[in-house]
Amino acid sequence: MKHQDVAIIIPSRLSSTRLTRKPLQLIGSSTLIERVFKQVNQTNLEHIYVATDSQEIASVIEKLGGKVIFTDSNIPTGTDRTYEAFKLIPNNQNINYIVNVQGDMPFIEPESILKVIEDLKNSKYDIVTPVVKVEKDSVEAASNVTVAIDSKGKAIYFSRSLIPNGAEEFLYHVGMYGFRKSALERFVALEPTFLEKTERLEQLRLLENGMTIGTCLVNNVPISVDTPEDLSKAVKFYEKSKLV
């Protein structure tokens, strides 16, 4: 089995401010977290875990044969939850790379996850994250994040504003991160930064502290479910696509 030194962790907290019991909302006959897990599981990696504070979520995943790690409800961010889960993986001294896949992307493509892993292993970046080329009309919503990169694909800045200003085509940031273990350990030890708090983007903590984030280009923007409107969009996509 490939990538024995990689763990994929899906943080999934039951409480959500904008969509009640978000991970357990149905898209067709399956819950949101089920769909995320099934997509991630298609990578065929051995070390795939859902990190949660909820027995209900754990039961859903365990019925699918998945592995669950319980984490505290009060952990502030998905990345912090990812690290807490990583520390509880048996024999984690053999894990050198950790991929954080957000638990709100029910149609995330396994190919995108594998591309992040390959690019991380084949580079010297601390972190690798996927981006998608999109037109201006596709990224107007405030919940969407764009990224400016240098000529080699290294991230310069992330923003909820459209960057670079005046462009017609942008790089949409997909909320998934591949970390070297040392980078994840360093991240959680750092205090939140000014830009991070201003933009409400935790990846800016990395940039403000001199860490490097590489980007890898993927084909499709995955639907992220944060609001009732997002859930409706996901249900319509599911029905149109005739997914199982």
Swiss-Prot record:
Pathway(s) this gene product operates in, as recorded in its UniProt entry: Nucleotide-sugar biosynthesis; CMP-3-deoxy-D-manno-octulosonate biosynthesis; CMP-3-deoxy-D-manno-octulosonate from 3-deoxy-D-manno-octulosonate and CTP: step 1/1; Bacterial outer membrane biogenesis; lipopolysaccharide biosynthesis
GO molecular function, one term: 3-deoxy-manno-octulosonate cytidylyltransferase activity
Catalyzed chemical reaction(s): 3-deoxy-alpha-D-manno-oct-2-ulosonate + CTP = CMP-3-deoxy-beta-D-manno-octulosonate + diphosphate
GO BP field: CMP-keto-3-deoxy-D-manno-octulosonic acid biosynthetic process; lipopolysaccharide biosynthetic process
Keywords: Cytoplasm, Lipopolysaccharide biosynthesis, Nucleotidyltransferase, Transferase
GO cellular component: cytosol
NCBIfam families the record matches: kdsB, PRK05450.1-1, PRK05450.1-5
Function comment: Activates KDO (a required 8-carbon sugar) for incorporation into bacterial lipopolysaccharide in Gram-negative bacteria.
PANTHER family tied to this protein: 3-DEOXY-MANNO-OCTULOSONATE CYTIDYLYLTRANSFERASE (PTHR42866), 3-DEOXY-MANNO-OCTULOSONATE CYTIDYLYLTRANSFERASE, MITOCHONDRIAL (PTHR42866:SF2)
Family that this chain belongs to: Belongs to the KdsB family.
Protein name as catalogued: 3-deoxy-manno-octulosonate cytidylyltransferase
